From Swiss-Prot:
Signal peptide: none annotated. Pfam families: CN_hydrolase. Residues 1-82 form the CN hydrolase domain. The active site is at D21 (proton acceptor). It comes from Saccharomyces cerevisiae (strain ATCC 204508 / S288c). Belongs to the carbon-nitrogen hydrolase superfamily. Nitrilase family. PANTHER family: CN HYDROLASE DOMAIN-CONTAINING PROTEIN (PTHR46044:SF1), NITRILASE (PTHR46044). This is Putative nitrilase-like protein YIL165C. GO terms for biological process: autophagy of mitochondrion; macroautophagy. GO terms for molecular function: catalytic activity. InterPro entries: C-N_Hydrolase, C-N_Hydrolase_sf, Nitrilases_CHs. The lineage of its organism: Eukaryota, Fungi, Dikarya, Ascomycota, Saccharomycotina.
C-alpha cells in the first residue's frame, strides 16, 4: 500500500475488514468442533482470526499516518494536509505530463490493414 501512495503521490485509505472467526462467514463446518483444529490446509484454527484487518491511512510520501489496525474492530481517522499532494508532485508527477499537449500526443492509426498468416 505504501508504494501505491508514494508512486501515485496521493493519500491512500485502505479499509480492510476484520472477522474474528470463520463461523461468521458460514464456514464453521470446516473446523472440527471437538478439537478446534482446521479441516482444510491453510485455514486458521478456531483460535485465530479469520480475517485480521489491517486498515491503514498513508500520505503521498508513503508514510503511515494512521494504523495499521490489526486484530480488532475500529475506526481509523487522520488529519490530512492536502497541500502535501501538490508538494509531493513537484518531484514526481506520475500523470501530469500527459495533460500537456506540447509534450504528449497520442495518435491512433484507424486504417484497416491486411492480415498475413505465416506457418
Amino acid at each position: 500500500m505504501k508504494n501505491i501512495a508514494y508512486e501515485g503521490r496521493l493519500f491512500l485509505i485502505s479499509a480492510v475488514q476484520f472477522m474474528p472467526d470463520a463461523t461468521a462467514m458460514g464456514f464453521g463446518e470446516i473446523i472440527d468442533q471437538a478439537t478446534g483444529k482446521r479441516k482444510l490446509p491453510g485455514w486458521p484454527s478456531a483460535d485465530d482470526n479469520c480475517i485480521n484487518g489491517g486498515s491503514v491511512i498513508i500520505d503521498p510520501y508513503g508514510e503511515i499516518i494512521a494504523g495499521p489496525l490489526l486484530g480488532q474492530e475500529g475506526l481509523l481517522t487522520a488529519e490530512i494536509n492536502t497541500d502535501l499532494i501538490a508538494e509531493a508532485r513537484f518531484d514526481l508527477d506520475p500523470v501530469g505530463h500527459y495533460a500537456r499537449g506540447d509534450v504528449f500526443q497520442l495518435t491512433v492509426n484507424e486504417r484497416s490493414h491486411d492480415v498475413k498468416f505465416t506457418k
